[in-house]
Amino acid sequence: MTSSMKRISILLAFAVALLLTACAQKQKENQSVETKTLVAYFSATGTTAEAAQKVAAVTGGDLHEIQPAEPYTEADLNWRDEQSRSSVEMADKSSRPAVKNTVENIDKYDTIYVGFPIWWGIAPTIVNTFLEQYKLDGKTLVPFFTSGGSDKGETLKYLQPSAPNGNWKEPMNLNGMSQDDVKICVESLK
């Protein structure tokens, strides 16, 4: 093999290596774009979990269930009993029930959908506990809720102080919505 052929072979091998490196880098960039949305939710009965799964499917976001350190029992959720755990927690707006789990590397998310059922006209205080665990400055925070008949009530009034420097959107009522309807709601935010 002549010396010019060797040079050409070396240059071609170098060009192929550069091309493969560029393709691998582009693939990494595309993967990181896909993981910029988090769908965090608290669901006592499963209704909000269903809505969260639809939001995650539409957005391509990662799902995170906000789990109470002490799971709620049926008796805890009895809103007719003023002494039930949920009634006591919701009567004290400063109540912060402990959360069992956390989100690793929350910094990688630009947009966080936060789902919950409406309890007493607002989000359950465990959602405040979740928000207060992290520095969410500059992140887009999109509350969504489910309810047996209530509207958003004063949800934002009580959630915003838990992440005061977040870019809050209006809460979305996703109760009983199909995935197509959820997609319309999510796309209306853009």
Model region roles, listed by residue range:
Residues 1-10:
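Bacterial N-terminal signal peptides that target proteins for export
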Residues 19-22:
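C-terminal motif of bacterial Sec signal peptides marking the signal peptidase cleavage site
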Residues 24-110, 121-123, 132, 179-190:
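N-terminal beta1-alpha1-beta2 submodule of the flavodoxin-like/Rossmannoid cofactor-binding fold
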Residues 104-107, 136, 150, 154:
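Surface-exposed, polar/charged faces of alpha-helical domains
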Residues 106, 132-138, 162-163:
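Short, conserved loop/helix-junction motifs that constitute active-site signature segments
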Residues 116-117:
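Glycine-rich, N-terminal phosphate-binding loop of Rossmann-like dinucleotide-binding domains
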Residues 142-178:
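Short, glycine-/small-residue-rich phosphate/pyrophosphate-handling segment
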